[in-house]
Structure formats: structure tokens, C-alpha cells
UniProtKB/Swiss-Prot annotation:
Homodimer. This is Aspartate--tRNA(Asp/Asn) ligase. Its EC number is 6.1.1.23. It comes from Bacillus cereus (strain G9842). It is found in: Cytoplasm. Residues 200-203 are annotated as: Aspartate. GO terms for cellular component: cytoplasm.
């Protein structure tokens, strides 16, 4: 078999007159009565191959048997297309290849999905036949971008003198965070490894070990309920460094991300990225990952509501809640009563009891609650919300968390429905000064907002024992277009501070020692100040490639129920395998 001389998408007018050897898949076959045209595809693109009896009867006879997705080896001569046959939409659109020989390397059944960017297959079919789905150019281009992003990050971190170090996949189960995937040990009866949710502890121990600058393209595993932007196994760019301040870490990440955007996407983004405190993000956008590509910020009306004539508003404030509103500029005529009812049902999903609304017309406020506001109150509302005729005002009165969640989600929905979002923009944002702990009423205890190894502000360390809810974290999240790309923090590196953190989280001394004794001991041997960040590679590629589903950026992803439709994993194992591990199944009976 002759060697391939050209990739299909790389045959240009410079090759006219040359004999070429091409190999690829049949994208399309057209029989024009005596002539057969085939679009031959490989990962670089498509080239048109012509089978003409005047050039080769033998090749034409073979071409008559060819169907879509056959794998071919074609030998032929490159010629320029006639003036009326030029296709400027293709890189190879000014030439074609006159076939002199063709060899079918492999035949193909009719594929269950159309191998094209616009396929008609459901996602389940695409996942079952993932190897066919990956042939679509849009999929290859996504993974080419993933490669480019990873390569740029590796090159950047190399110039910054970071070492790429691999950390264990079989590790110790810890109680914080999501559920672990457990792996039984054959050697140690009744004991289990866990697959890592992140390399967090190991990268900190590398700092104890004096490596100073570490990174890893790390596989991570979390047994959690899945959403469109979650997978049970995922990849993160894991970074840790000693002796750097928070500002130095953020500056380095900004330089890295601007290079990624330029090299992988061809987009210039300016640094430094804006910074916003967590409290401000929640107050202004109702989200800890705000999409800043459009306005429509939340306005706090609690002070006004406390003295207004609308009891729903006043009672919310009196019970310790708040009233906030968003002004959908010019949207009054675009939302009917039925549409607003749909918005009301939408916010109820986030815990809101309802959605109050007003439309601003030339002669004043109109709507179900307009009668509760006199002229003075109406003017205050108009002024505070910067409202003009044609605006739609939407209010939620409830607990602070419910107001933030519901109006934050409503803001995003309206932004999409009203086409306020400039999809060409890439808005990076740092969210800083997070709360260190979050209180869970159901569990009646505090949980770490990020993880238990996050350093509090120095002046807040004592609050861990007196007022844990007030302690702030030296933590930072990187947000892009309303998606959390990753999070990081400065880390605790002193044993006494780490023990205070564990105590605030409800660990007894014995529990802390059992779970994290190795880390606590390491802190007694001269641990340097250190910090880092972990960026979600899958999500970053999803945003840069313009995809809407995380599964499109992972070669062989799982479904929303954490199963692989291609291999049918997870699956039962043989009884002998369980016996070897001294395990016995006790399955719940189906009701």
C-alpha cells in the first residue's frame, strides 16, 4: 500500500498536476450517469474525487460499489475545477482529484447516525455509537481545541518553572465533599481505596516536600447527582505554588488565560480581570458566578418595602427577609399575563412563593399590585429602579437566599429570552472574599464553602471558635460568562489553624486525627505558605468551542445517570471476582 502523500483537506491548487495518494472515508457519493463524484473525508477536511471512464474504467467499476463511510485509498491526479464548479466554501473547492486507482480498505454498514455537523441522532444514539459521533467534523474540532488549550497551558506553566507531577488515583476516602467512588482492596480485607475527588492533599504535601511549583492535568471522580455541566469523572488543571500571595496567583492565572484565549481561540482578552467580592456578586446578581455580559442587576428595595403599603413586602422585611427587583428594560410589551405566569412558576422552583410585577406605562404603573402604591411610593419605585415607560418590573420578597437564587436565575432567563447577551464576548471575573463556612440547617452543622484546607483571613482565625459564620476565606473563583471555571485559595499551613478549622466543622480530635493525621503531622515539619487553583478543563473547552453540553468535550462521557451507553458500564461482575475480594452483594428489593 502506497504511503499517503496528502491529507484530504490540504490538497490545494499548488498540487495541480501532481499524482496524490489519499486515504479517508466516503462522506458522500453522487452518480451523474457515467461519472461518479465522491467527497473523501479525513480529519483535515474534504476533497472531491472524480471517477471517469476515460481516466480509469477499473476505478469507476470499484466506485460503483462504494457507499458512505467506506474507507478508501485513492490514487489520482489533481486538476483545477471548471469555472462553474468552483466551491469557495471549501478549502479544496478550486480543485478535484481525477482517480486512476481506488482500493476499498474497509466497507461500512449504513450508519445509525448521519456523519455531519447537523446530525439528526438523539444524544443517547450518539453516545451508544460514540466512535461514529466522533467522526463528525464539529467533534474533531472540539477535541483539537481541547488539545490546543492543554498544550498552551502546559507550555505556559513550563515557562513559569512548574513541574508536572502525577498524584495517586487510589487514595484514602475522606468525609468532606461529594460521595467517593470506592475501590475494594483484595490485599486488605474489608478496606477500600477511594478515587480522588481532587489531588488537594497530595499537592499540598508536594509543597511540604519543597517542590514549590506543581501542576497536573488531573483526572477527578465524584459520585454526585449529575447536571448538564457535571460528569462523574472529569479533568481539571490542578496548580499549586509556595511563597506566592493571592495577587501573584491571580496575576499568573490571568496571564495564562489570556494566552489560552489568544492561542486556542484567537481572541484577545484584557487583563487584569475585574474582581468582585462574593457579597457584592450575590447582592448585585443573585449569583456567585455572575454573567456580566449584560446589565439587569438586582436592586434592594427592603428599606422602601418596610414602609410601603403592600403587606407582602412589609411582612417579608419584618421577618428578616428582603425585597429585591429587576427592571427588564423595554420588556413590558413582550410579556403577556400568561408569560408572566410562566415566570412565576419558574421562580417557584427556586423557593420563591410568587413573583410580583408591574408594567411601566406613560400614565404610571399598571399591574396587580399597582393599587398598593400611592403616587409618592410609585415615584420612589420609578426612581430607584430607573424605570421608564415600557419597562417590566419584577419583584421577589422572601428570605435573602431565596431572593438571590430566584431573581438570579430569572435574570439569566430574561437575558436569554430578550437576547441581551452578546455571545461573542468572553467576560472573565474573579469572585473573592468568600465565606469560609456555610451552615446546613438540616445537618445542624457547618460545612466548608470550598474545602476544609482553605486559609481564613488572618484577622478571622479566632472567629472559628466564636462566630464561625463571620469568618472569611482567602478564596477566589474564576468565572467566565456565568460559568465557574475553577476555584482556588491560599491554604492553611499551620497545625493549630487546621485543627481549629476541623473543630468548627464538627470533627472531634480523634476524627480529625484518623482522617487527616498525616497532614497534621506534615504541618509540623516546616510547611511553607502556599496556595493554588483548579480549573475545569472540560468546561473551559465547552465555552471556547461554543458547545452547550459538557459531554461534547469528553471523548467517552457518561450519561446523566452515570452510565456509558457504549460499553454498558457499570455492569455486574462475576461471583468469583466478588469472592476474591471477600465481598457479598446485598441489593435492595425493587418496590
Amino acid at each position: 500500500m502506497a504511503e499517503r502523500t496528502h491529507a484530504c483537506g490540504k490538497v490545494t491548487v499548488e498540487a495541480v498536476g501532481q499524482t496524490v495518494q489519499l486515504k479517508g472515508w466516503v462522506q458522500k457519493r453522487r452518480d451523474l450517469g457515467g461519472l461518479i463524484f465522491i467527497d473523501l473525508r479525513d480529519r483535515t477536511g474534504i476533497v472531491q474525487v472524480v471517477f471517469n471512464p476515460e481516466t480509469s474504467k477499473e476505478a469507476l467499476e470499484v466506485a460503483e460499489t462504494i457507499r458512505s463511510e467506506y474507507v478508501l485509498h485513492v490514487e489520482g491526479t489533481v486538476v483545477e475545477r471548471g469555472e462553474g464548479a468552483i466551491n469557495d466554501n471549501m478549502a479544496t473547492g478550486r480543485i478535484e482529484v481525477q482517480a486512476t486507482k481506488v482500493n476499498v480498505l474497509n466497507a461500512a454498514k449504513t450508519t445509525p447516525i448521519i456523519i455531519a455537523d447537523d446530525t439528526d441522532a438523539s444524544e443517547d444514539v450518539r453516545l451508544k455509537y460514540r466512535y461514529l459521533d466522533l467522526r463528525r467534523p464539529v467533534m474533531f474540532n472540539t477535541f483539537k481545541m481541547r488539545h490546543d488549550v492543554t498544550k498552551t497551558i502546559r507550555n505556559f506553566l513550563d515557562t513559569e518553572e512548574f513541574l508536572e507531577v502525577e498524584t495517586p488515583i487510589l487514595t484514602k476516602s475522606t468525609p468532606e465533599g461529594a460521595r467517593d467512588y470506592l475501590v475494594p482492596s483484595r490485599v486488605h480485607d474489608g478496606e477500600f481505596y477511594a478515587l480522588p475527588q481532587s489531588p488537594q492533599l497530595f499537592k499540598q504535601l508536594l509543597m511540604v516536600g519543597g517542590f514549590e511549583r506543581y501542576y497536573q492535568v488531573a483526572r477527578c471522580f465524584r459520585d454526585e447527582d449529575l447536571r448538564a455541566d457535571r460528569q462523574p469523572e472529569f479533568t481539571q488543571i490542578d496548580i499549586e505554588a509556595s511563597f506566592l500571595t493571592q495577587d501573584e496567583i491571580l496575576d499568573m492565572m490571568e496571564r495564562m488565560m489570556t494566552k489560552v484565549m489568544k492561542d486556542a481561540k484567537g481572541v484577545e482578552v484584557s487583563a487584569p480581570f475585574p474582581r468582585m467580592k462574593y457579597a457584592d456578586a450575590m447582592a448585585r446578581y443573585g449569583s456567585d458566578k455572575p454573567d456580566t455580559r449584560f446589565e439587569m442587576e438586582l436592586t434592594d428595595l427592603s428599606e422602601f418595602a418596610a414602609g410601603c403599603g403592600f403587606k407582602v413586602f412589609t411582612s417579608a422585611v419584618e421577618s428578616g427577609g428582603q425585597v429585591k427587583a429587576i427592571n427588564a428594560k423595554g420588556a413590558a410589551s413582550k410579556y403577556s399575563r400568561k408569560d408572566i405566569d410562566a415566570l412565576t412558576e419558574f421562580v417557584k422552583v427556586y423557593g420563591a412563593k410568587g413573583l410580583a410585577w408591574l408594567k411601566v406605562e406613560e400614565d404610571g404603573l399598571k399591574g396587580p399590585i399597582a393599587k398598593f402604591f400611592g403616587e409618592e411610593d410609585a415615584n420612589v419605585l420609578m426612581t430607584t429602579l430607573e424605570a421608564t415607560a415600557g419597562d417590566l418590573l419584577l419583584f421577589v420578597a422572601d428570605k435573602k437566599s431565596v431572593v438571590a437564587d430566584s431573581l438570579g436565575a430569572l435574570r439569566l432567563r430574561l437575558g436569554k429570552e430578550l437576547e441581551l447577551i452578546d455571545e461573542s464576548k468572553f467576560n472573565f471575573l474573579w469572585v473573592t472574599d468568600w465565606p469560609l463556612l456555610e451552615y446546613d440547617e438540616d445537618a445542624d452543622r457547618y460545612f466548608a464553602a470550598h474545602h476544609p484546607f482553605t486559609m481564613p483571613f488572618r484577622e478571622d482565625v479566632e472567629l472559628l471558635e466564636t462566630a464561625p459564620e463571620k469568618a472569611r476565606a482567602q478564596a477566589y473563583d474564576l468565572v467566565l460568562n456565568g460559568y465557574e471555571l475553577g476555584g482556588g485559595s491560599l491554604r492553611i499551613y499551620e497545625r493549630d489553624v487546621q485543627e481549629k478549622m476541623f473543630k468548627a466543622l464538627g470533627f472531634s480530635q480523634e476524627e480529625a486525627q484518623e482522617q487527616f493525621g498525616f497532614l497534621l503531622e506534615a504541618f509540623e515539619y516546616g510547611t511553607p505558605p502556599h496556595g493554588g487553583i483548579a480549573l475545569g478543563l472540560d468546561r473551559l473547552v465547552m465555552l471556547l468551542a461554543g458547545r452547550t453540553n459538557l459531554r461534547d468535550t469528553i471523548a467517552f462521557p457518561k450519561t446523566a445517570s452515570a452510565s456509558c451507553l457504549l460499553t454498558e458500564a457499570p455492569s455486574p461482575v462475576a461471583e468469583a471476582q466478588l469472592e476474591e475480594l471477600n465481598l457479598k452483594l446485598s441489593l435492595k428489593e425493587e418496590k
